[in-house]
Regions:
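Flexible, polar/acidic helix-loop-strand segments at domain edges
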Residues: 87-94, 311-400
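Bacterial Sec-dependent N-terminal signal peptides
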Residues: 1-28
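Conserved, well-structured interaction surfaces
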Residues: 41-55, 79-147, 162-173, 177-191, ...
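Short, surface-exposed recognition loops and adjoining beta-strand edges that mediate ligand/DNA contacts
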Residues: 33-34, 38, 58-76, 153-156, ...
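Long, intrinsically disordered, low-complexity segments
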Residues: 17-21, 40, 72-73, 79, ...
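Membrane-proximal, proline-rich intrinsically disordered regions
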Residues: 19-68, 487-504
């Protein structure tokens, strides 16, 4: 088994650029001797584990989807959070080919595709193969979303070989065929949310059909009626799985969300106290140093985004049992004076009131404002049982039923079924304590997706699909269409099949 696990975890360093001595050594090690069923299970576990880095933290894929949007800003706070301008570049759409965050995510997504594809040469069971192929497709979809072209190797192809590349149209066709092929061999959905499952594959297919027009023409997307019909029928298939909107919105993300949520479709299992999860970074990246848990005082929400919520909307946040009574920390958006569990007002490091101000600039220099600038976000309730150096119990959420319903509503609206779409949206809004909409437009549907799915790594994709990504918003001017795609990192262009995206 040792030879397999050397591959599984050391391969996290793989990139798409081509041949390295490390790659040659890895490939040679796994070729020695037979691989048994336990080894294949280990390889599959490593494929799931490889998803933690790019997806299960605010620093990587989430940063590329959220900090580049109208939802999140990471202001430079005096000498804190400068990072050579990396965070400012994401929000302002001023990144270049050498942006480290973009490079790291591209590499990490490639690691998932390598591990999950390589597993197929070791005689997996039908279900193991289907799960691996789903993870492969999941990561490839992200690469397509971000970069518009997808490097790939055939299963079992040497890690020293130069990857071929599929452009958007071919990749879309490939992903649709691949997901339809593996559907029969995946486990059923609701009982297997922590694994690749049939309903997770259907959600990914929905996202492919819904974004197809945007992936083919990002500047002026079009939406084929047949593609929208596929989105609707897939949503109907998922609806037979017994999902329902969870009574308490934030229970979808709680330490016991595997029990409390009735709408989670695909999650990553986290076991409290065990290594492997980065989920605690979700609250540390945004909370102040003097809060519990102590944070890094970074990520904030823009006031224009926050103001999209009605005061009655439970998604905006408030007190949360097991969190507010333990530390004083509320859930959702944190605005104004912050308190501890005894209702004592907290201070910042300068002795000023720790009262988060909705007004925030991308560069904060006022000593009395820089620590309190910006609304903070706590989407995942804190696991105080597994705090400090331990890892939280909350399962990471990839797909939820609410997203399925909103995608169905969007497809209906784009196909001229506005009344039915409005009914779906109002079902969600009523569940969340918001007033019913009287009409549904693309603009207020985009707003509703923001309200329901904030901090879940969909905002950039949504803004591009709705034609809003290049628009100005707080602390960002109108910008160049080249930013509809990320640049191929400089260190990947040793692959002659990768061509730098236009404008870079």
């Amino acid at each position: 088994m040792k030879k397999v696990y050397i591959l599984s975890f050391a391969a996290l360093a793989l990139s798409w650029s081509g041949c390295t001595k490390l790659n040659e050594d890895l490939h040679g090690q796994v070729g020695n001797g037979a691989v048994g069923s336990d080894d294949v299970a280990g390889l599959l576990a490593a494929s799931y584990g490889a998803m933690v880095g790019p997806y299960q933290s605010p620093w990587n894929w989430s940063a590329l989807q959220e900090v580049t949007s109208d939802e999140i800003i990471v202001p430079t706070r005096g000498g804190d959070w400068d990072d050579n301008g990396a965070w400012r570049a994401l929000h302002l759409h001023k990144w270049a080919e050498d942006h480290q965050r973009i490079s790291d995510v591209f590499k990490d997504l490639g690691t998932i595709t390598y591990l999950s594809g390589d597993l197929l040469r070791y005689n997996p069971t039908k279900q193991q193969a289907a799960e691996a192929r789903f993870l492969h497709a999941f990561a490839q979809f992200s690469i397509l979303d971000g970069w518009g072209q997808v490097p790939y190797r055939e299963p079992g192809e040497s890690s020293t070989s130069v990857p071929k590349v599929r452009k958007a149209a071919d990749e879309i066709d490939y992903l649709i065929d691949e997901l339809n092929a593996i559907l029969p061999d995946l486990p059923e959905g609701k009982a297997n949310t922590i694994r690749a499952n049939k309903d997770a594959a259907r959600v990914l297919l929905m996202k492919i059909y819904l974004n197809k027009g945007a992936f083919l023409n990002r500047l002026t997307p079009t939406f084929d009626a047949a593609d929208m019909g596929k989105v609707i029928s897939l949503a109907d298939d998922i609806a037979t799985g017994g999902y329902a909107l969870t009574d308490h919105y934030f229970d979808n993300f709680a330490p016991t969300n595997n029990i409390l949520s009735t709408e989670n479709i695909f999650t990553a299992q986290n076991i409290g106290g065990s290594p492997g999860s980065n989920l605690d970074e979700e609250w540390r990246c945004t909370l102040h140093y003097n809060q519990n848990p102590s944070g890094y005082n970074g990520f904030s929400t823009l006031s224009d985004f926050y103001n999209k919520f009605e005061t009655s909307d439970t998604r905006r946040g408030g007190s949360y049992a097991g969190q507010t009574d333990v530390s004083g920390l509320q859930i959702g958006f944190l605005v104004g004076q912050q308190y501890d569990q005894d209702s004592v007002a907290l201070k910042d490091r300068n002795g000023n009131s720790l009262a988060f101000d909705p007004m925030v600039s991308i560069i904060e220099s006022n000593r009395n404002h820089l620590e309190i600038a910006g609304i903070r976000i706590v989407k995942y309730p804190v696991d105080y049982v597994n705090s400090g150096s331990k890892k939280p119990e909350n399962d990471w959420v990839y797909y939820r039923y609410a997203d399925v319903l909103l995608m169905k509503a969007e497809a209906m609206l784009r196909n001229g079924q506005g009344a039915a779409a409005l009914t779906i949206v109002n079902t969600i809004r009523t569940k969340r304590g918001a007033s019913a909409l009287t009409t549904l437009s693309l603009d207020n549907l985009l707003d509703e997706r923001g309200r329901e799915l904030y901090w879940e790594s969909f905002r950039r994709q949504d803004l591009i699909r709705f034609g809003k990504y290049l628009n100005p918003w707080q602390e960002k001017p109108t910008d160049d269409p080249k930013y509809l795609l990320f640049p191929i990192p400089d260190n990947q262009l040793g692959n002659p099949n990768l061509v730098q995206n236009p404008g870079y």
